[in-house]
Amino acid sequence: MSTKQKHYLVGYGSLLSHDSRSRHSNIFCPNMPIVVNGWRREWLARGMAHLQTALGVSQVATASLNAVLLRIEQISPELRDREQDYQFIEVDPSTIVAAQESELAQAELANIRANPDTCKIFICVNLNKIQSNSQYPIYQTYIDTCLVGCFDMGVANFAAEFIQSTHFWEHGWINDRHNTLYAKPAMVTQQQQQQIDTLLKQQQVLEYRQEAGL
C-alpha cells in the first residue's frame, strides 16, 4: 500500500474560483463544496505586498463557513506565493461536512477520515488581523472572484451563505471593476456582476461599498 501523503486545502476565498486558482496558482481539481465548523471568515487579512485586505479566518467554536475542498499535490511555490500573508494550519477532518450532501465531497471526506496518517487537510490562516481601510482596501474584483466561485459550486444559496458567514464588511471596500486592482481575478461577466450586486444588496452589505477614488 502506498504511503504517499495526500494534501488537501480548504479554499474559503478566491480559491473558490476554479478559473482564478487554475490560471494563477496551477491548481486543477474539481469543486468539492464543504462546510467547516469552528472557523470564522473575516475581512482581516492585510496583504502587505498588494496593499489590500483579503479574507482570513479565526478559530471560533460557534462559527462555521462554507468553502471548497481542494486536492493538491503539494504546497507549491505558486501556492505559497499566492498565500504569502498566511500560514498553513492542519484542520481536523471531523470538523468538515459535505455541503448539501455533495456526493463527491462526501466520498473524499470518507477517504480522508479512513486514512488519517496519509491524508492531511490544511487551511490558510492570516498572519495579520487588521480591519480594512483606504490604504489597504477590500477590492470588489476580489469579492467577484469569490462569488463567481460560489456560483460554480452548483449548491443552492452557497453564495448567500458565503456573504452571511463573512464578517467585517463595514470598512474600506472599494469598487475597482473599471480598473481591476486585484492581482488574481476570475473572469466575470457583466451579467454575473449584476447578480453579485443584487445578492450583496439582498444581504444588506452593498451599502458599505465606495467607488474607487472617492
Model-inferred region functions:
Residues S2-L214:
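A glycine-rich, hydrophobic/aromatic-adjacent loop/helix-cap motif
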